[in-house]
């Protein structure tokens, strides 16, 4: 059943960390909707900047938003003008003090979300789906990943009947919990309709740390 579950969600608390880090009792639903609105807005606004993921941390009086991007210059803008505009717009979505931090994704070819968005962009530009998938997979393998699997679903090449095509390179052990699997999903808006793109990237094994009796880590 490894293909049917989000690999990140399966590994959260074992080798992966949460994207939202906060605790709430009565306000849980409000915070959840607020997080969703912040992420949706930033993803749409900064799509050209190649945003890999957005982490949100909350304290009693402030919200910290960490944006992981392949192009930090696009997010920050000339003299920090763009980031100030973004801060002002995101501030409207929350009533707490907002802190925005930008972190660069050094190797975008090894990031599953960015690879999926790259394939989707090529499909929108009428590149053959096979060429788009295989070129991105080749770059990822050259970047040093252990394995990559890509799937495209929809009216591929303008066919009358929708279908799914999958390509693999290397190994992607989806059922091994200690395997560091990065997963990304994107949609391409083509003239024939939407095409879904999924990418799994295997980066190697990570051994989970167990807390010992003294409270340290083994």
Swiss-Prot record:
GO biological process terms held by the UniProt record: translation
Gene Ontology cellular component list: cytosolic small ribosomal subunit
Keywords on record: Ribonucleoprotein, Ribosomal protein, RNA-binding, rRNA-binding
SMART domains for the chain: KH (SM00322)
CDD domains membership: KH-II_30S_S3
Molecular function (Gene Ontology), one example: mRNA binding
Residue intervals of the KH type-2 domain: 38-106
PROSITE patterns: KH_TYPE_2, RIBOSOMAL_S3
Presence of the UniProt keyword Phosphoprotein in the record: no
Subunit structure: Part of the 30S ribosomal subunit. Forms a tight complex with proteins S10 and S14.
Entry's family note: Belongs to the universal ribosomal protein uS3 family.
Role: Binds the lower part of the 30S subunit head. Binds mRNA in the 70S ribosome, positioning it for translation.
Name of the protein: Small ribosomal subunit protein uS3
Species whose genome carries this gene: Agathobacter rectalis (strain ATCC 33656 / DSM 3377 / JCM 17463 / KCTC 5835 / VPI 0990)
């Amino acid at each position: 059943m490894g293909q049917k579950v989000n690999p990140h969600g399966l590994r959260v608390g074992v080798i992966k960390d949460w994207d939202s880090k906060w605790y709430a009792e009565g306000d849980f639903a409000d915070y959840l909707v607020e997080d969703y609105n912040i992420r949706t807005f930033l993803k749409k606004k900064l799509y050209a900047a190649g945003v890999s993921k957005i982490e949100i941390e909350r304290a009693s009086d402030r919200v910290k938003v960490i944006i992981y991007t392949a192009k930090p210059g696009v997010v920050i803008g000339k003299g920090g003008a763009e980031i100030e505009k973004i801060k002002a717009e995101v501030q409207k979505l929350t009533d707490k003090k907002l802190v925005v931090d930008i972190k660069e994704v050094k190797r975008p070819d090894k990031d599953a979300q960015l690879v999926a968005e790259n394939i989707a962009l090529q499909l929108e530009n009428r590149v053959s789906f096979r060429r788009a998938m295989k070129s991105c997979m080749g770059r990822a393998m050259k970047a040093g990943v252990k394995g990559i699997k890509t799937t495209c679903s929809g009216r591929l090449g303008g066919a009358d009947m929708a279908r799914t095509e999958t390509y693999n390179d290397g190994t992607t052990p989806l059922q091994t919990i200690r395997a560091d699997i990065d997963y990304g999903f994107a949609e391409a808006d083509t003239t024939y309709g939407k095409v879904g793109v999924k990418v799994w990237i295997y980066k190697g094994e990570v051994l989970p740390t167990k807390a010992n009796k003294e409270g340290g880590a083994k």
